Structure formats: C-alpha cells, structure tokens
Amino acid sequence: MARQVKRRPHASARPESSSDSKKPKLKHGRHQMRTVTRTARRPGQQDFEEESQDTYDNQQLGEDGQNDEESEDEQEIEQESGKAYEALLTLLKSDHKESKPARKSDKVEENQDEEEEDDEEIAGANVQNEEDQDNEDDNEDDEDSARGLAQDPLEAHFNRVEDSYIDNQERLVIKEREKWTTVEKKTYDNLGYSSLTQSPPGRAISIPSKTKVKISDFFIKKRVLDAFEATYPSDFEKLSPLDLALLEPMMKYQDINFPYKTFSNTSYRKLYALHALNHIYKTRDRIIKNTTKLNNYREALKNGTANLDSQEPEFRDQGFTRPKVLILLPTRNSCYELVELLIKLSGCEQQENKKKFMNQFYAKELPPDTKPLDFRDSFKGNNNDFFCLGLKLTRKSLKLYSSFYSSDIIIASPIGLSMILENPDKKKRQYDFVSSIEVLIVDRANQIEMQNWENVATVMRYVNKIPKDFHDADFSRIRMWSINDQSKLLRQNLIFSEYLTPNINNLITSKSFNIGNKTKFKPIINSNNCIMNSIGLKLKQIFQRFDSPSPVSDPEVRFKFFINTVLPSLMKSSSYSDGIMIFVPSYFDYLRIKHHLKSSTKFNFGSIDEYSSQSKSTKARQQFMAGKINIMLYTERLHYFRRFEISGVKTMLMYGLPSNPVFYKELVRFIGKSVFREQCDLDLAFVKILFSKWDAVTLERVVGNERAHALCNSPNELFEFR
C-alpha cells in the first residue's frame, strides 16, 4: 500500500517540526526561478506521484461538497489559509464598526447568527479552505474542440504564446521602454465616441478575428450564454453598437480604458461581469481536462499499458495561486450590485453565505432628495469603503466569503486590499493571493480617485508579484511566464470611469504592459454637448491661460502666477469686496494657498475642506453668507463628499478646472443662486478660471474640443464666454 503524505499548511504559517527542520531550504530567488527550463515530473517518479498527489490541483478544481467530519489537521490548514482575512477583520473591528438599527423581524435571526458574526466579521475569516473536487462533465468542451481551440482568444493569449516571444517582448516593452504604435483609429459618430488601438513594440499577440454581431458569436461558455440570455434577452439577440464596440477588444484580452460619461450608463458592467465569469469557467475547465489526461497517463503507466518510450504529458495551465480576477470598487454598495449581477450571470443554482453578505453589504439608506442624482447614486446604500471579498465558483454554487487562496474572484476596495498587502504587522502581511491575477478590473475609478489614489498605486505594486511562499504549487503545471515574473505582460487591465483624468490614463499608458494591445475610448465632446452649454445662465466666464513648460513644473508655475498676477488684482477686478470664492481642485494646492493668504496677506478669509468638522464648515459658510468673511477657500473633494450649496457667492475664482465637469456647472450656479436672491447683479458677477495647455483634457469637457484647442494654442491668453 502506498504510504500517505500529510498535506502541509501554507508556507507562511507552517508550524515548525523536526521533519521540516531536516529538509534543505529551497531557493526561490529570482535567479533560480529564471533558470528553470523544465519542471514536469519524469515517468520514473510514478511511485512518488501515487504517494503524494499535489494539493494545488485540487484547490484549482474546487468541489461541490465537503464531508462534515474533517480531521484536526484539515481544520488547522483551513484556519491558516484565512490569515489574510483576519488581518482585515482586526482593522474593521477597531476602526470601522458599523451600527445597524435592530429590526423586530430580524431579532431571532440575529440571535442565531450572533456567534457566527463574531467569528466571521468580514471577508471569510475562519472560513474553511475546502478542497473542491469539481469534476464537471461539460459538453461545452466538445463544442470548443469542434470550433477549434486555436480560434479561442483565451487560448491564444495565455496558453499558446512562445516563451522566446515573451522574452523578446519583455526586453522591448519593459526593459528598453520602446514606443507603442497606433494601429487603428475609429470614430463612432452616432455613439459619441472615438477609439484608438495601440500595439506594443515588436508585435502583438495574434488573435483570430471575425465579424461579430451578437453575443453568441464570441467564444463564451454555454452556461454563461444561457444565463445572459435569461437575464438580458434583448441584448442576447443583438448587442447595441456601443456594447459591441466595447466587448470585441475585451474578449480579445486587450487593455481597455473606457469613460462611460454618466453614472446612468451601466451597460458596460454586464459585459465585464460576463467576461470575468467566462474567463474563470474556461480556465477551470481547461485545468480539469488536463488533470484528467495526466491521471489517465499515470494510471496507464501503473497498469503497464502506457508506451514506456513516451514522456509524461506536460500541461502549463496555471499560476502560483488560484485567484484569477481582481475587481476594485469604491464602496460596499457597488460590490453588492456587482455580486448580484455575477450571481445572475454565473448560472449557479446555489449561493453560500448570501445572508451574511446581505447583512454586511446591503443597506436601504438613500441620500436626501435635495442632493444631485450622481451624488445619490455614488453614496446610496452601504457606502463603507473598507472591504475585501473572495468569491469561489463551483459547478452548482457560488460561494461568498471564500478564503483568498481558494477564491476565483477577489472583489475589494483599494484601501481594504492595501491594508492586507501592507499590514502594519509584518507577520500578517499577505500578497501571494494576487500573484496570479490575469484580469484586473477597476470600476468607478473616479470615485476611487476621490477617496485616495495612493491605495490603487499600492495594489498595482503587488499584483503579479512573485509570491514569497508557494502554497504547495505544482511547478510542473505553472506557466513559464509566471515563473519568470512576466505575468504583467499577459494581464488584461479594464479601467472604467465617468471621465478621464491623468491618474486614470496613467494606469493604461504607463502601468500597463499587456502585449495583447490596448484600446482607449474617448468621448466626443464639442461645443454643442459640452457642460458649458447646460448651465442655463448667461454669466461672464473668463479663461486665463498661463505658460507652463511641463506637467511636472505646472503646480509650481501655477502657484507663482496666482500669487504674483491673479491675487493682487483680485479685489480690484471684482465688483464686490465680499462673496469671493476660490475653488481649489488639489488639497495640496489648497494648503499652500491657505498658508500664503494667512502669512503674506491681510485678506479676511475662511477655508473649508474635506477634513473640516461639521461645526467649522457650518460656521464658515454662515459667516461667508453674512459678509463677515470676504474670501472662502473651497476644495473639490469637499464638494464631492458633501455637495454643499454655498450661499453668498458673487465672484468665483477657479484655481484650476474641476476634474468632474458636473462640478463646474454646480459651482457656476452658486452665483446664479445669489443673482436669484438679488444679492448681486448678473452683469457684474463673473467666473475666472486659470488653466495651462496641460489642462486640455479637462478643458475639453467644459468648453468642447474645438474651443479647447483654440484656448490652448491661440496667441491670446484671455478668453471670455457667456
């Protein structure tokens, strides 16, 4: 009888034992990993294979059920695998306690679940890391084979690329930083978009292409197609032109930067949800199929029916860890909406831990009706921005709160994930579970940017980083480009935002290395549909340009121009000595201006920002409205989070254009409110905006592309609109 080898916990939490101490320490350095040429086992290792079946295959496959009685060793392993979640649990309990009013109908349920909630506060702490044997017999594999795996974009992008090709692309794209070339430009006049596709230096991955009209024309798993048809029957028959233009590069695993223009446009979400599920199911089924082939070969070898001259088949179809899709979202409510969509499109009959998920992520609360519609959409429901959730897909169920290392999809806020990746307690830091991400999705990027973009930068540093521990990974199944730290060259990045900003553009232009091409969408904004035309107020709007040599020096040049040219003449140019608001987009510029006004001028001013207390904000606004404060400093992030309607504004000075064009409209209407109350004259009030040529993208959203080009390139520096 073959002896059994006990499975080990994750290396990061492996208990010390005498047997471990005797084993030589493996070298996992970058040099050692790059010199690997073959890791598949030889036929001579048959006996060892029978004795110790690698657990990583089982983790990748998943199972539908689990025995109720588990050994103590199994339970210990499950608890160790939840360490990343426990780090987030500790932080949430200390800093982010939530209070929910008790409902009579829930009292009994709450008492029953009280103990469970204490143990599993957030994101799968102490959730068992079950090993699912999901032996799905799927007829879709036969269909895929008939259509030809060579035509499948997933196979072409991840599994059929040559190692020598990736090595060469790494040299050109990352090491030598050669320029990408534009290979295609499209204009969708009836959709209000244009697109630009760029190809990496050398050559892009070749993806077979044919004309597609409906969603069934794409290589999508039948179970996902059936669920999509049941949920969106009209879209199943024929996709809208915009959805088709977006889905085609998405299914080819190209990077995409897509501004959806308005919060009410949510159609793109069903597309990336479908794409993520399709990627998970196809990857899992490929692993199952290859594992079956390996097992058949080993069984034949054991029975003596195999060809002894043939080598064991080699299948490189995995990464270091199981999670393949990472989705970054700003709030728990946005996570709730996405999970509901994933459940609909997954085709799963059961959902595990759904009640717990509803309790922690769903809320009925809505912002006041007096707030703008986009504000109500952003902050509806549970707007807590601290979460990290694992989702595991099996043949019949979708499990919420699965441990990170047994999850297929990770949905997280940037701050929630970054607190795990860079936990202050070094012993609790975990980042191995994002080492094998193949599809990265950032949705509602503008909301995330308003929270703290540094957390996104933190996440990007750890995605596809070589893991510090290998968690019983079977190196004979890991793709060579993963072992050689080249995953970033194959990872697809999908970025969705309401409007484009330098930070968001940078994710695709500078932080993306996907050699499968990148497609950037851009809204067509002209003088007819720009935000300026929707103000409904014939107010003088003065745009003043200053010369700035580079984006890096722009903040310094802007500040000097402001204090030397604009500020000294501010009181003279304004028809009113009070009611002057200075709007500052950047918090750092705001602090600098505030310090200058306080130390170098005698202006009677007040200031409110996103960190001001409620009492201070209320007092400053009242004093400004009463004329006790002549000048008010006001930040963009404060406006985003509170949407104040400031009274008493007679003159508006914008230190820079707001990134959100809707804010420009709302700020200008502050003056309209004063005009309506007869606090100032429409002909005497005005708005003045400072800008440089580096503000062209933001300027275009306000005045339109034709005017923006003229404002940035005209010999004149002063422009007036009404």
Swiss-Prot record:
Region Disordered, annotated ranges: 1-162
Signal peptide: none
Statement: the UniProt record of this protein carries the keyword Ribonucleoprotein: yes
Cell compartment(s), UniProt: Nucleus, Nucleolus
GO molecular function: rRNA binding; U3 snoRNA binding
InterPro entries: P-loop_NTPase, UTP25, UTP25_C, UTP25_NTPase-like
Record's compositionally biased regions (Basic residues): 1-11, 24-33
Compositionally biased tracts (Basic and acidic residues): 93-110
Record keywords, A-Z: Nucleus, Ribonucleoprotein, Ribosome biogenesis, rRNA processing
Biased composition (Acidic residues): 65-79, 111-122, 129-144
Domain of life: Eukaryota
PANTHER family, per database record: ORF PROTEIN-RELATED, U3 SMALL NUCLEOLAR RNA-ASSOCIATED PROTEIN 25 HOMOLOG
Subunit record text: Component of the ribosomal small subunit (SSU) processome composed of at least 40 protein subunits and snoRNA U3.
Role description: DEAD-box RNA helicase-like protein required for pre-18S rRNA processing, specifically at sites A0, A1, and A2.
The protein, known as: U3 small nucleolar RNA-associated protein 25
Name of the coding gene: UTP25
